[in-house]
């Protein structure tokens, strides 16, 4: 009888959608919260990755049409891909599960993972970044030949820093929260951000012919980092407005 009962339990477990091992319905809620949070983190990764892809491909393609030197080299694109894949995955995977996802409506199993809001974000942010970069390409084309090398280095750094700040916005995509709300979240993002920033500085200052870069002075770094940070602050203002509207 014991063996038969055990076989029945095994069959029931295999046939069931959910099996409670600790006789607690709290386990179901926890599992759903983790599942929804993981799904949202995947969506955030897609938003960040596709935005970089759209901007990088479009800027290289349009730069060729303008008849300028390739704005991004192969080795520079390898660094961008490292940011896009490895570092972005590390940063977004460090986001802890949030109980807020339990307030969202259940999604259908056949829903496409790229939602309307994601498409708007990818295309909207991508278009803004592309407009900035194409303006820089036009300016670089009109520069004297001896200044082009430094200008292309600044172009590369601006491109990376735009994505750098956008990574913070992507980490809270789908919510109205501030990037600075959760200290655990901020710590994980800050660690990855430091790695990206230090890596970019090393590539620019010591990359030389391999990365087609020229060293930049301290104030140029300050101007680029501060100037591109508008990406983060616009995102913060937008989410703040959304929070105010939600309260009203």
Language-model segments: residues:
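Hydrophobic alpha-helical transmembrane segments in multi-pass integral membrane proteins
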Residues: 132-136, 194-209
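Membrane-embedded transport module
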Residues: 11-175
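Extracellular/periplasmic helix-loop-helix junctions in multi-pass membrane proteins
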Residues: 205-221
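Single conserved hydrophobic/aromatic residue that forms the stacking wall/gate
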Residues: 1-10
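Membrane-interface capping segments at transmembrane-helix boundaries
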Residues: 237-248
């Amino acid at each position: 009888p014991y063996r038969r009962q055990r076989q029945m339990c095994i069959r029931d477990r295999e046939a069931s959608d959910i099996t409670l091992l600790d006789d607690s319905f709290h386990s179901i809620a926890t599992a759903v919260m983790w599942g929804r949070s993981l799904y949202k983190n995947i969506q955030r990764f897609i938003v960040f990755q596709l935005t970089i892809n759209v901007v990088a491909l479009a800027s290289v393609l349009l730069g060729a049409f303008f008849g300028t030197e390739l704005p991004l080299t192969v080795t520079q694109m390898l660094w961008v891909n490292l940011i896009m894949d490895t570092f972005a995955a590390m940063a977004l995977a460090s986001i802890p599960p949030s109980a807020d996802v339990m307030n969202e409506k259940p999604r259908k199993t056949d829903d496409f993972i790229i939602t309307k809001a994601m498409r708007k974000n990818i295309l909207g942010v991508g278009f803004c970044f592309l407009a900035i970069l194409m303006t820089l390409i036009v300016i670089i084309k009109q520069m004297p030949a001896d200044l082009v090398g430094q200008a292309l280095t600044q172009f590369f750094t601006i491109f990376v820093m735009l994505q750098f700040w956008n990574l913070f916005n992507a980490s809270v995509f789908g919510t109205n929260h501030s990037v600075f709300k959760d200290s655990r979240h901020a710590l994980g993002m800050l660690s990855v951000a430091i790695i990206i920033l230090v890596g970019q500085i090393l590539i620019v200052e010591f990359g030389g012919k391999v990365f087609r870069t020229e060293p930049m002075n301290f104030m140029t770094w300050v101007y680029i980092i501060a100037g591109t940070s508008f990406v983060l602050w616009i995102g913060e203002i937008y989410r703040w407005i959304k929070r105010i509207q939600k309260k009203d």
